[in-house]
């Protein structure tokens, strides 16, 4: 299956000059969703994963079914103030300002082998923050996987030294 054929591209969204890669078309088709989750799982088959971690919001959409398929837990990483229990935080830079991500303190145990999953790798700032949170809790990041990678934005540079997979690549 050519997954790229199932990703809707919307020009000038959310603003002029942006070419938005819409994964809702993957989610709407059961066969395509199954294929996507199976391909993500294939990249992890030889790793002994304890947890899948996914950032808000689209990391939840692929991370949860992947965790189910692998028989492991799923850990959400959310924006500040959205998780109900004790958290740790990591700030990261945006184009104009900063944002903050949080994870529950008890979600990752020391030595847990963790795979991080998200829909898209662009500049790498969000995922680099997720890596920091997992490692601060004592987890070992054994893989970082994406459905889509925007290669021209060089997000992999912020993840140097980690095993990284993406199913579809776009040059923007």
Curated annotation (Swiss-Prot):
Localization per Swiss-Prot or TrEMBL: Cytoplasm
Pfam families listed in its UniProt record: Pribosyltran (PF00156)
UniProt enzyme class: transferase
Gene Ontology terms: biological process: adenine salvage; AMP salvage; purine ribonucleoside salvage
Main location: cytoplasm
CDD domains noted in UniProt: PRTases_typeI
Record's keyword terms, sorted: Cytoplasm, Glycosyltransferase, Purine salvage, Transferase
EC code(s) of this entry: 2.4.2.7
Reactions mediated catalytically: AMP + diphosphate = 5-phospho-alpha-D-ribose 1-diphosphate + adenine
GO cellular component: a single term: cytoplasm
Subunit-structure text: Homodimer.
Purpose: Catalyzes a salvage reaction resulting in the formation of AMP, that is energically less costly than de novo synthesis.
Family indicated by similarity: Belongs to the purine/pyrimidine phosphoribosyltransferase family.
Protein name: Adenine phosphoribosyltransferase
């Amino acid at each position: 299956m050519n997954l790229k054929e199932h990703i809707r591209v919307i020009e000038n969204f959310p603003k002029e000059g942006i070419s938005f890669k819409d994964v809702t078309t993957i989610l709407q088709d059961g066969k395509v969703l199954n294929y996507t989750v199976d391909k993500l799982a294939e990249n992890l088959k030889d790793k002994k994963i304890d947890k899948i971690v996914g950032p808000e919001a689209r990391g939840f959409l692929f991370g949860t079914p992947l965790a189910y398929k692998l028989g492991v837990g799923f850990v959400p990483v959310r924006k500040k103030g959205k998780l109900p229990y004790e958290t740790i935080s990591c700030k990261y830079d945006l184009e104009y300002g900063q944002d903050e991500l949080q994870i529950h303190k008890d979600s990752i145990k020391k030595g847990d082998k963790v795979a991080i999953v998200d829909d898209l790798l662009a500049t790498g700032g969000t995922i680099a923050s997720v890596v920091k949170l997992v490692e601060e809790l004592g987890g070992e990041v054994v893989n970082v996987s994406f459905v889509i990678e925007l290669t021209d934005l060089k997000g992999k540079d912020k993840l140097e030294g980690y095993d990284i997979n993406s199913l579809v690549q776009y040059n923007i």
